[in-house]
Swiss-Prot record:
Disulfide bridge map: none
Its membrane topology: Multi-pass membrane protein
Pfam families membership: UPF0060 (PF02694)
Protein name: UPF0060 membrane protein SAV_4756
Similarity comment: Belongs to the UPF0060 family.
Subcellular location: Cell membrane
Positions of transmembrane segments: 8-28, 33-53, 62-82, 91-111
SUPFAM superfamilies: Multidrug resistance efflux transporter EmrE (SSF103481)
Length: 112
């Protein structure tokens, strides 16, 4: 159950961080305006809070593991929001990152 909660928090964090960055991108690069930028900044702030809800107490471990989720989530976001089509190397890289996240976050640790 702890792994499921942790994975759900990683997904929530990714939605807020990637979504927030995308909103800022839309506001600046696509000239959608300050409301988009403001919403993006708020979403990025929520991301920072969601990351603190992880059950593991180690900041470095949480953020390093989250990096794998961020990579895969960014590609998925691009597919859904912008019609981006990742190539086999994008997918391979994302899978490697997710494997690294799994090892960092969920490998058995004796006494830790």
């Amino acid at each position: 159950m702890l792994v499921l909660r942790s994975a759900a928090l990683f997904v929530a964090a990714a939605l807020f961080e990637i979504g927030g960055a995308w909103l800022v991108w839309q506001g600046v690069r696509e000239h959608r305006g300050w409301l988009w930028i403001g919403a993006g900044v708020m979403a990025l702030g929520v991301y920072g809070f969601v990351a603190t809800l992880q059950p593991d107490a180690e900041f470095g471990r949480i953020l390093a593991a989250y990096g794998g989720v961020f990579v895969a989530g960014s590609l998925a976001w691009g597919m859904v929001a912008d019609g981006y089509r990742p190539d086999r190397w994008d997918v391979t890289g994302a899978l490697i990152c997710l494997a690294g996240m799994t090892v960092i976050m969920y490998a058995p640790r004796g006494g830790n």
